[in-house]
A protein has these predicted regions:
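Conserved N-terminal beta1-alpha1 strand-loop-helix module at the mouth
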Residues: 1-193
Length: 193
């Protein structure tokens, strides 16, 4: 999650495929007003993802309508009915996060009605990877998260996920670090060439 004007400046310079604003928890959380101000300075060609945990459709809709976010990422206990409601009401793509500890978790994620699934270790934000061998023959686009950093960026990219979702692995002392951001993106882009 991006929280400071410098994070936005770096993202605009480095051009990731997505940028995120966290609207849940304590770490990296931004208010609606903070996110709106940050979004104004983010390159309009970079879609902003709003990260939510068991939030209301009304709150998500307010952020979509304001142009603060273009994609909704759900990290709570949201079921397929909520995923359908978000997609149909807000007309934006939905990413649903799943904690992966077993092959059954992967199968459950694969059956989600979300546009994309995000596969993570635990509740997210732990800095730990799950066992990537569990991915096996996953047959749908997925975001890979959990424990990603510049040191394992190439190995993660080699799994051919739709996207990599990195946060704590590009931070120093809990804040985004431009050099780590740059290194992570350079390694992923070099691999994909």
């Amino acid at each position: 999650g991006l929280t400071r004007p410098c994070d936005i400046a770096w993202a605009t310079e480095l051009r990731p495929d997505y940028a995120g604003f966290v609207f849940a928890g304590k770490k990296r959380r931004v208010s609606d007003d903070q996110a709106a101000a940050l979004r104004k300075d983010l390159d309009p060609g970079i879609p902003a993802v709003g990260v939510f945990v068991d939030d209301s459709l009304e709150h998500m809709g307010k952020l979509v309508a304001a142009g603060t976010i273009q994609i909704v990422q759900l990290h709570g206990q949201e079921d397929d009915a909520m995923i359908d409601a978000v997609r149909q009401s807000l007309q934006v793509p939905v990413i649903k996060a799943f904690s992966i500890a077993s092959q059954d978790d992967v199968r459950k994620a694969e059956q989600s009605r979300a546009d994309y699934i995000l596969l993570d270790h635990g509740a997210g934000g732990t800095g730990d990877c799950f066992d990537w061998a569990l991915l096996g023959q996953l047959n749908r686009p997925y975001f890979l998260a959990g424990g990603l950093n510049p040191d394992n960026a190439v190995q993660a990219a080699a799994l051919h996920p739709y996207a990599l979702d990195v946060s704590s692995g590009i931070e120093t002392d809990g804040m985004k670090d431009k050099e780590k951001m740059k290194l992570f993106m350079a390694r992923v882009r070099a691999y994909r060439r």
